[in-house]
Amino acid sequence: MELQLTGKESGWWIVSHENKLWLPKGELPQGNAANWSLQGATARQIGEWQGQAVWLIRQMMSTDMGSVRQLLDVDRGLFQLAGRGVQLAEFYRSHRYCGYCGHQMHASRTEWACLCNHCRERYYPQIAPCVIVAIRRGDEILLAQHVRHRGGINTVLAGFVEVGETLEQAVSREVLEESNIHIKNLRYVTSQPWPFPHSLMMAFMAEYDSGELRHDPKELLNAGWYRYDQLPLLPPPGTVARRLIEDTVVLCREEQFDDGE
């Protein structure tokens, strides 16, 4: 339930608008609302972190509006809560009116949803399922530079799940479309909420099966096989892509050690 802040409330403050996040001094604000001049603002608690409430305020600040990416190097749990806040703020902003009848909607008091009193339609935040996979061939891992990535970062392959397909089918399809290779021994590893803008990354590892590597220029600038101890610039720590790469490196080292014995 939303409330108007008196200034005495305390916790972590997620102030967000249009997928931007208020980060004074590059950090997520913490402490009393009055210390950040937030009294009078409308807030809603969206979780807890380290025993303190996490509050969402849906508004634009005049300065220090940044990206939730800037919190990647903080604790994973806090990054996820910040991502939740940014996604919820954008959800409420984009669902002020019902898509069926055009009447104004209001936020539910019991769940993350927007309700229409006129036609009784109910809307929930959109979550886009994505698959991401690390592919190993002996002591090498397949890495690529995506056209949308900056700074020369090399990462593993990923893509959105299409309507009517399983996660496993999505992995195989994306790999074939982007690299022209087939994979085998696919296994699930972990997942990560990814608020750019509203994805849920489901991570896999797989082994090379067949096919000649040929990247899709519409998706990738280049792609190649890299030995596990000669890797290029990688995604930052805290990303599920980095986790997959590091797990693959561990496997390669273990196999090399076993072969050495």
Curated annotation (Swiss-Prot):
Entry binding sites for a divalent metal cation 3: E174, E178, E219
Gene Ontology MF term list: magnesium ion binding; manganese ion binding; NAD+ diphosphatase activity; NADH pyrophosphatase activity; RNA NAD-cap (NMN-forming) hydrolase activity; zinc ion binding
Cofactor binding annotation: Divalent metal cations. Mg(2+) or Mn(2+). Binds 1 zinc ion per subunit.
UniProt catalytic activity: a 5'-end NAD(+)-phospho-ribonucleoside in mRNA + H2O = a 5'-end phospho-adenosine-phospho-ribonucleoside in mRNA + beta-nicotinamide D-ribonucleotide + 2 H(+); NAD(+) + H2O = beta-nicotinamide D-ribonucleotide + AMP + 2 H(+); NADH + H2O = reduced beta-nicotinamide D-ribonucleotide + AMP + 2 H(+)
Residues engaged in binding substrate: K25, R69, E111, Y124, Q192, P193, W194, P195, F196, P197, H198, S199, A241
Cofactor: Mg(2+); Mn(2+); Zn(2+)
Protein name: NAD-capped RNA hydrolase NudC
Binding site for a divalent metal cation 1: A158, E178, E219
Recorded GO CC terms: cytosol
Pfam families: NUDIX, Zn_ribbon_NUD
